[in-house]
């Protein structure tokens, strides 16, 4: 969704300037946070309610030191406004598995992304009604000496959950954590990572630092 106020355009010497086209930064920020799932103060933030969530906008003009190399009369003499360094690579590690074909992506990153997407699905479809928006994933893949994939060695998942979940287990935090762990195995890991990739003694770490209950959030 693009939220803009009214705008005017000036055309001069084959150059177009847009004036007055100001994004509604506050609305965009609220919409993005709400789409992620932060719609309740109880779980960390209610982005939809101004009384409970304020959005501060700090948008300023470009640094004068950078601007002096950008705004030039001659297009040929204009410099870059900033520099960026990007790196990455394509590979065929994902292409041996039907669920991952077409990605041409490093296997650990591809599997981590699939886990993250699955965390959102189990929350939005109420498969795990106690799940909350804040979640993180990491996958460690073991390789043979020739560089071929041996299998998944470690899966790390952190998932925020309902603070009342322990009440289902007589207040036991240990039982609560084991329930979260088994649920992640059944509904996230085993339906996301191809079974042939999971090494027999792979390590699964769920909420490794302990309880991760409400409130969480950004």
Predicted regions and their residues:
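Single conserved hydrophobic/aromatic residue that forms the stacking wall/gate
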Residues: 1-8, 12
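Active-site-surrounding "flap" and adjacent substrate/cofactor-binding loops of secreted or lumenal enzymes
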Residues: 21-33
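Glycine-rich, mobile lid/loop segments that gate access to catalytic sites or pores
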Residues: 34-38, 42-217
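Short glycine/threonine-rich loop-to-helix capping motif typified by GTGT followed
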Residues: 16-23, 210-218
């Amino acid at each position: 969704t693009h939220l803009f106020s009214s705008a005017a355009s000036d055309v001069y010497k084959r150059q177009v300037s847009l004036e007055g086209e100001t994004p509604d930064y506050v609305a965009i920020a609220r919409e993005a946070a709400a789409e992620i799932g932060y719609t309740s103060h109880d779980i960390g933030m209610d982005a939809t309610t101004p009384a409970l969530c304020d959005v501060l906008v700090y948008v300023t003009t470009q640094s004068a030191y950078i601007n002096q190399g950008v705004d030039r009369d001659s297009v040929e003499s204009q410099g870059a406004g900033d520099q960026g360094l990007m790196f990455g690579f394509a590979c065929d590690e994902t292409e041996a598995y039907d669920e991952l074909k077409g990605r041409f992506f490093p296997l650990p990153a591809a599997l981590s992304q699939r886990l993250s997407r699955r965390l959102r699905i189990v929350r939005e479809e109420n498969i795990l009604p106690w799940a909350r928006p804040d979640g993180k994933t990491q996958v460690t893949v073991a390789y043979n000496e020739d560089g071929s994939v041996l299998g998944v060695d470690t899966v790390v998942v952190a998932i925020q959950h309902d603070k009342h979940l322990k009440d289902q287990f007589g207040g036991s935090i240990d039982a609560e954590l084991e329930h979260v762990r088994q649920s992640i195995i059944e509904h996230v890991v085993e339906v996301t990572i191809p079974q042939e990739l999971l090494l027999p003694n792979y390590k699964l770490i769920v909420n490794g630092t302990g309880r991760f209950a409400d409130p969480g959030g950004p």
